[in-house]
């Protein structure tokens, strides 16, 4: 039974033309195992920046955030360490992306309900970074680039996305 489920899941992923396996250069940078580094991966893929460069930049941004604030998030960063390996707060990665020339485009408001899903026909073309529930993912011309298919069969809600105004017409 388990093998049958695994086979069906693998077959579903293999047949999804809207998904491409992409670790953003994580393996090439020498990292192994699993990690909650979706922010690093998504930024590396969408900006075409080496994984290690993004990792180091976010680590530095985490350190600056933790050192310059007295919030719960800053204290949590200090206590768990500044590594972006196991997640990043939006308060850190959004200014990082904005410093690279990227802009935020919300796709829903509080209490509004989902209007845009993680589907090619509902997203702009070009390179974007979509914010989902507890996840960031790079989408390149409608193709989800990630270590797993996070589309939920096109039903996953997109809260908004980052885009580079100089690259595309969003």
Each language-model region and where it sits:
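Short linear interaction motif-like sites in intrinsically disordered regions of transcription factors
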Residues: 2, 20, 103-105
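Acidic, Ala/Val/Gly-enriched low-complexity intrinsically disordered segments
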Residues: 2-4, 11, 137
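Active-site nucleophile-adjacent alpha helix/oxyanion-hole segment immediately C-terminal to the catalytic cysteine
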Residues: 6, 10-74, 95, 100
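N-terminal hydrophobic targeting segments
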Residues: 14, 124-126, 162
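Detector for Asparagine
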Residues: 15-18, 22, 62, 86-88, ...
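Polar low-complexity intrinsically disordered regions enriched in Ser/Thr and small residues
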Residues: 27-28, 90, 157, 163
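Conserved active-site-adjacent core of cysteine acyl-enzyme catalytic domains
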Residues: 65-134, 140-142, 147-149
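Active-site signature of cysteine proteases
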Residues: 134-135, 139-170
């Amino acid at each position: 039974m388990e093998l049958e489920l695994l086979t069906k899941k693998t077959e579903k992923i293999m047949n999804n033309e809207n998904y491409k396996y992409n670790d953003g250069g994580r393996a090439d940078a020498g990292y192994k195992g699993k990690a909650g580094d979706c922010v690093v991966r998504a930024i590396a893929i969408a900006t075409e920046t080496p994984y290690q460069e993004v990792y180091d930049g976010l680590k530095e941004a985490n350190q600056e955030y933790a050192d310059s604030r007295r919030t719960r998030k800053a204290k949590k960063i200090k206590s768990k360490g500044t590594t972006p390996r196991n997640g990043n707060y939006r308060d850190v990665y959004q200014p990082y992306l904005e410093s690279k020339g990227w802009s935020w485009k919300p796709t829903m408001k509080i209490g509004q309900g989902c209007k845009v899903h993680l589907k090619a026909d509902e997203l702009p073309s070009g390179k974007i970074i979509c914010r989902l529930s507890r996840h960031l993912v790079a989408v390149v011309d409608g193709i989800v680039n990630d270590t797993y298919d996070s589309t939920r069969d096109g039903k996953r809600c997109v809260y908004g996305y980052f885009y580079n105004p100089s690259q595309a017409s969003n």
